[in-house]
Amino acid sequence: MAPLALMGVVLLLGVPHCLGEATPTPSLPPPTANDSDASPEGCQGSYRCQPGVLLPVWEPEDPSLGDKVARAVVYFVAMVYMFLGVSIIADRFMASIEVITSKEKEITITKANGETSVGTVRIWNETVSNLTLMALGSSAPEILLTVIEVCGHNFQAGELGPGTIVGSAAFNMFVVIAVCVYVIPAGESRKIKHLRVFFVTASWSIFAYVWLYLILAVFSPGVVQVWEALLTLIFFPVCVVFAWMADKRLLFYKYVYKRYRTDPRSGIIIGAEGDPPKSIELDGTFVGTEVPGELGALGTGPAEARELDASRREVIQILKDLKQKHPDKDLEQLMGIAKYYALLHQQKSRAFYRIQATRLMTGAGNVLRRHAADAARRPGATDGAPDDEDDGASRIFFEPSLYHCLENCGSVLLSVACQGGEGNSTFYVDYRTEDGSAKAGSDYEYSEGTLVFKPGETQKDLRIGIIDDDIFEEDEHFFVRLLNLRVGDAQGMFEPDGGGRPKGRLVAPLLATVTILDDDHAGIFSFQDRLLHVSECMGTVDVRVVRSSGARGTVRLPYRTVDGTARGGGVHYEDACGELEFGDDETMKTLQVKIVDDEEYEKKDNFFIELGQPQWLKRGISALLLNQGNGDKKITAEQEEAQRIAEMGKPVLGENNRLEVIIEESYDFKNTVDKLIKKTNLALVIGTHSWREQFIEAVTVSAGDEEEDEDGPREERLPSCFDYVMHFLTVFWKVLFACVPPTEYCNGWACFGVCILVIGVLTALIGDLASHFGCTVGLKDSVNAVVFVALGTSIPDTFASKVAALQDQCADASIGNVTGSNAVNVFLGLGVAWSVAAVYWAVQGRPFEVRAGTLAFSVTLFTVFAFVCIAVLLYRRRPQIGGELGGPRGPKLATTALFLGLWFLYILFSSLEAYCHIRGF
């Protein structure tokens, strides 16, 4: 209610001068720069309306009181409706800017070990985009209003455009920040993350308005010279470059190291030059420290590599948090939640929050929630095309293809499978044995024959005889091959080989391998390989220990883990130490080691598993033979030979008795992170791909729910009454602006250009309506600009900052861009307009005159109040409060009241000065 009451006071300021007049004040020529604003005409304003850029004067020019009221209502309602239209087209405009600034490029990163990896990073620097396209998008009405006002009035300076820029700056600095401070929930606070950039933009913001005062009241009072106007415009790229340097720590940031700390008593930030520190810098990072793991080395690499590393760490942290919250879900299920969670919690641009606020206000719904609902309704991708080999033919192969048997087993049984097909044919397939290291006749019995699969049969067995001997020998193997497939009908009659699709085929594995294990030795114990690569997400790794060259007797085999670069004790893996007991004729055992899942994007740590000396549990004849020489009793030659043979059969370690285990990152986890980085691009959420999509979106009413569920999107609720009302109020604008090219066309530039033109037309209409409203009620353009026009252009930014303050983890998106926008408004808005006008009048041989009185007073007042505002924000970084936004209830309410009071005083003093109640400059 306070802003409404303030507007009423402003409207009443000019009334006392006009109550006693029977007729309107006659029209006078506009005063020049040398005229005093204290003249009766300058103090009370004029009821005589002038033609606008697009709108003519409403005839007749001398209406009655009732007609004046009706006209004022029409102008005011039309102006509000135009503000709604500008907000909606700005929605499209900001979406195109988000698409443009979200463009990515691939970079190749070479690590210290020579390995390379490819990633994608944004082409646009965040700070540069915020101060250029983002600032242009959020301040386009103010900037274009100034340019159109000057160019549309014969290059004469007006009061509406500059007043709107200063008034909008005051509203953003005081009211928007006050709202952001207040809406943070109790007990929470938000800090500016990139404080260095904030210092630079805040300094330029204050300098911009100091510079305005200097060129209006000091250098050349009442006249803007060409060099002043051009220098104002040049300050815009200079400001952007300085902010970019601060963000990148270039020049003096590179050569002068500073330590920043906060005095616990005063809360003042203290800097001291010196060696590279290891304390917290202004942006919250640690200088001189590296991130653990290989990616930490990227901290000294290119900025793109650091940016990619930061994006990966954010996504990894999201997956870790969700895994702790939902331990029962697998990675695929977590990815579905993580997509929404990443969109919800990632740092968002000013464009996103502006679009989100506009759509919530106009009944278009929550951007993220609608995107999640559309993704859920969208049919999933197919699992892939069917296998080319799955053509309806039966497939015949060994299952399994590897067999092990002891030398004394007598025979080994092999299985052949028949899968697929129609099951109404008879198949004949031949088999035969082939020598390997085992020879037919001495180690196994040669065999060949034919297997017959009748209709419906899916498995056939064949048996191969094994020859036993008492000679100690190494493990040997031979092969069994399938060949010569023939097809018959159900009765078994062979069918001719036609040219059509085959009914059956032999597929791999066609060759089975049979390994004969010697049973005359206790065995050689070893790992299957010297090296084992495991993924950190495995949880538990199973390591096989094989017993070859014999399997006689019971053997106990000790083992233990040894640290390498990986650390045991639960850091990278759990220590394992124990014994494996191999029974008689047992050829394989498995030991388990638990791996700790650190969920790292890149990882390569190793540890070792060592086997101890095997112990033969002395039982039966082996124990007797080995213990015969322990006593004094002499043994015979036969006994000595038997003992020697038994000694040869003792268990021993093989060559691979030490296994190196390399723990690597989970490839599924790594792929998930890469997919999430690609899919969490907000340009995919707020952008449009076709006109059809835009028109459907324009006529659809959605619930404007600001609350977000971190566990994923909830069920879509029905729109409220407010959503329907706002939708029907704005449906004309929505359908009209659905004709704008989709953001996907020309990478967003087509939409960008059309939106600029549309915003320009609407801004010209707003300027004319505001001017006609002011002259109808007797309100001066300077007051009209700082109150009504500035308020109308800044309302969407207020809601955008509110949403950003609630949803972002830091304060940069909500208030960090306020100072940058204020500076850009002056340098770009006034710089372009005044440069064009100054050059035009210089060519004509005349000066470009600008009345300094009201504008200079407003600029000075705003600058003083802005110093107070920034000082309070920095003071709020004390530990007792916690940050620029939120904090304890007392300081939060006090800050909100102070900032709203500053805005109230700014409007009041500017209005009093405009109506000559107080003396200005």
UniProtKB/Swiss-Prot annotation:
Binding site for Ca(2+) 5: 536, 598, 600, 665
Disruption of the gene: reported phenotype: No obvious phenotype. In hippocampus pyramidal neurons, calcium exchange activity is reduced by about half, suggesting that other, additional calcium exchangers are active in these neurons. In these neurons, the neurotransmitter glutamate triggers a sharp increase in cellular Ca(2+) that does not depend on calcium exchanger activity. In contrast, the decrease to basal levels is mediated by calcium exchangers, and is considerably slower in mutant mice than in wild-type.
Segments of this protein annotated with the region Putative calmodulin-binding region: 248-267
InterPro entries, alphabetized: CaCA (IPR051171), CalX-like_sf (IPR038081), Calx_beta (IPR003644), Na_Ca_Ex (IPR004836), Na_Ca_Ex_C-exten (IPR032452), NaCa_Exmemb (IPR004837), NCX_ion-bd_dom_sf (IPR044880)
Signal peptide interval: 1-20
Stored SUPFAM superfamilies: CalX-like
Residues reported in the UniProt entry to bind Ca(2+) 1: 407, 443, 469, 473
Gene Ontology BP, a term: neuron cellular homeostasis
Residues covered by region (Disordered): 23-42, 371-391
Keywords: Antiport, Calcium, Calcium transport, Calmodulin-binding, Cell membrane, Glycoprotein, Ion transport, Membrane, Metal-binding, Phosphoprotein, Repeat, Signal, Sodium, Sodium transport, Transmembrane, Transmembrane helix, Transport
GO cellular component terms, semicolon-separated: axon terminus; basolateral plasma membrane; plasma membrane; postsynaptic density; synapse
Membrane topology: Multi-pass membrane protein
Pfam families: Calx-beta (PF03160), Na_Ca_ex (PF01699), Na_Ca_ex_C (PF16494)
Record PANTHER family: SODIUM/CALCIUM EXCHANGER, SODIUM_CALCIUM EXCHANGER 2
Family: Belongs to the Ca(2+):cation antiporter (CaCA) (TC 2.A.19) family. SLC8 subfamily.
Name recorded for this polypeptide: Sodium/calcium exchanger 2
UniProt organism field: Mus musculus (Mouse)
Gene this chain is encoded by: Slc8a2
